[in-house]
Amino acid sequence: LWELGAGVAAFSFPYYRGSDQTNNFVLPVPYFTYHGDFFKADRHGIRGSFFDSDRIDLSVSLALSPPGSSDDIRARSGMPNLDATFEIGPQMNITLWRSENRARFLKLLLPLRAAFTVESSPQDIGWVFHPRLNMDITDLPGMPGWNLGLLAGVVFGNQRQNAYYYSVAPQYATATRPAYQADGGYAGTQYLVAISKRFPKFWLGAFARYDNLSGATFEDSPLVRQKDYFAAGLSVNWILGESSTRVRVDD
């Protein structure tokens, strides 16, 4: 039903999608899994299931992004810092295919999230729609206990969301960074592969992600310095406690 632990994670991400600079950081991370009738927390994220059927379920989708100082980002030198952001909203999950033993499935994920800055007076910075296909494979052939996740999808943001990252107000324009007003709409594609395994005393997981901004409504922004890039992360978590009750997890 639940597991509790702690660990460490290392990440390598661009400062924002389209940045040509990488932000590498190591963080202590809590490890918590729970599978109740309503609330669930695991390698798929934190979510609450409001509606659940054999093929369709409705849950809560959450996302976080770290802050970025303009002193460290050449493209944004002299511009306001990028605050950490928090996103929350509903997500519909549609199971398109599932193996008889429920160890493999293909789902269509449809999250729509409102985004806010994380500061003393949070700002509404629009919304993000990120439909994607998710293939999960439990117990890889020849690798018992290892789980593989594959995701592929597109990203859309409204005008306020895209402007937060890609607009350049006239007062911040320079000879090499002209003023620019970002529009809402298509914001590129995203592909992710993740692998994980739960050992008796610890959990190990890693992922790699590829983003491509070609064709995005803001691709001509002077703040878009790189239209495609890779990001990656690795996490090791030690399990410190677990419930005596065990439940079957199908998703």
Features from the language model and the residues they span:
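Sequence/structural signature of outer-membrane beta-barrel proteins
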Residues: F11-R17, S65-D71, T95-S99, R113-S120, ...
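Outer-membrane beta-barrel transmembrane domain signature
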Residues: I94, S120-W203, D211-A216
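Short loop/turn motifs that connect adjacent beta-strands in outer-membrane beta-barrel proteins
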Residues: L1-E3, R17-G18, D37-I56, W97-L106, ...
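Extracellular loop and loop/strand-boundary signature of outer-membrane beta-barrel proteins
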Residues: P14-Y16, I46, A75-M79, A115-P122, ...
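Residues on the lipid-exposed face of transmembrane beta-strands in outer-membrane beta-barrel proteins
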Residues: V8-S12, P30-Y34, G45-F50, I88-L96, ...
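Predominantly the C-terminal beta-signal and adjacent terminal strand-loop region
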Residues: Y191-D251
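Transmembrane beta-strands of outer-membrane beta-barrel proteins
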Residues: W2-A6, P28, F39-A41, I56-V60, ...
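Residues that define the transmembrane beta-barrel architecture of outer-membrane proteins
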Residues: W2, T22-P28, D54-I56, L82-I88, ...
